[in-house]
């Protein structure tokens, strides 16, 4: 069921992300993700433009003749599916490349919000954590890849592949964007992937709203060059206001597989 309060909060955190990238003290941590984002996006966009025509022809070959009168609508859905698959490729690559820098940005945003240091060793501590960060990105890829493959296989089914699959792909992409960017502040506190995923699922409308806005802005020229640090800043604010108090002191306690909340406590301290 759609939760209007979570819908508003998801929008709020996205908007606040734009506010924080301009704050003094954070700008130098924003520059590197923007530069990496620009180089990677330009390269993949060139590849996408050079291959889009062949990809569309390939997808349209699966549409039977008796659905020819719907070809224009089905073509639009096919293009949407291809765009989302392109987006998934982009976010996966950018996640691996920019993970250390995004983790550092999330750390600095949290320090600005709370006044507390997460790591005391500065750059040395970040370098030490790079293998763990890359392992975390691999964990996210293992979670998402089987679902992407399933959606890809479903796209071969006539009509279903051109109507239902694009919608499911978009929703899954929104969910993955929430996971991708919220994971940086969670991972800075070494909260496990499963606990993080369950916690976000407990406020699914908020997560999907935030992830949906990030997804849509990725397709807007110029804005898409800034969206990575914006999403990291907004996700960190979401962590601080919704999950930080309830999770960071309870990481060693058992959590419900359905809700991600501490099963030994009726009040987890999560701020609504």
UniProtKB/Swiss-Prot annotation:
It is a multi-pass membrane protein. High affinity, high specificity proton-dependent sulfate transporter, which mediates sulfate uptake. Provides the sulfur source for the cysteine synthesis pathway. Keywords: Amino-acid biosynthesis, Cell inner membrane, Cell membrane, Cysteine biosynthesis, Membrane, Sulfate transport, Transmembrane, Transmembrane helix, Transport. GO terms for cellular component: plasma membrane. It is found in: Cell inner membrane. One of its GO terms (molecular function) is high-affinity sulfate:proton symporter activity. This is Sulfate transporter CysZ. HAMAP family: CysZ. The gene is cysZ. One of its GO terms (biological process) is sulfate assimilation.
């Amino acid at each position: 069921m759609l939760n209007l309060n979570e819908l508003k909060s998801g929008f709020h955190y996205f908007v606040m992300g734009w506010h924080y990238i301009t704050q003094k003290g954070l700008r130098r941590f924003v520059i590197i993700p923007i530069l990496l984002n620009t180089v990677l996006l330009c390269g993949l966009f060139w590849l996408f433009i050079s291959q889009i025509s062949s990809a569309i022809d390939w997808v349209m070959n699966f549409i039977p003749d008796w659905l020819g009168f719907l070809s224009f609508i089905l073509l639009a859905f096919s293009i949407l599916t291809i765009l989302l698959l392109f987006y998934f490729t982009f976010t996966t690559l950018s996640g691996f490349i920019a993970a250390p820098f995004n983790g550092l940005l999330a750390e600095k945003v949290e320090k600005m919000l709370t006044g507390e240091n997460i790591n005391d060793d500065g750059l040395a501590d970040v370098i030490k954590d790079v293998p763990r960060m890359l392992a975390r990105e691999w964990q996210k890829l293992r979670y998402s890849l089987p679902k992407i493959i399933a959606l890809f296989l479903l796209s071969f089914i006539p009509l279903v592949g051109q109507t239902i699959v694009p919608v499911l792909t978009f929703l899954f992409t929104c969910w993955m964007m929430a996971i991708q960017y919220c994971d940086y502040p969670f991972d800075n506190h070494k909260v496990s992937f499963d606990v993080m995923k369950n916690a976000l699922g407990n406020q699914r409308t908020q997560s999907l709203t935030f992830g949906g806005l990030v997804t849509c802005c990725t397709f807007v020229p110029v804005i898409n060059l800034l969206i990575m640090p914006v999403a990291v800043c907004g996700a960190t604010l979401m962590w601080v206001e919704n999950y930080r108090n309830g999770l960071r002191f309870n990481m060693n306690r058992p959590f419900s597989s359905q809700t991600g909340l501490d099963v030994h406590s009726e009040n987890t301290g999560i701020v609504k």
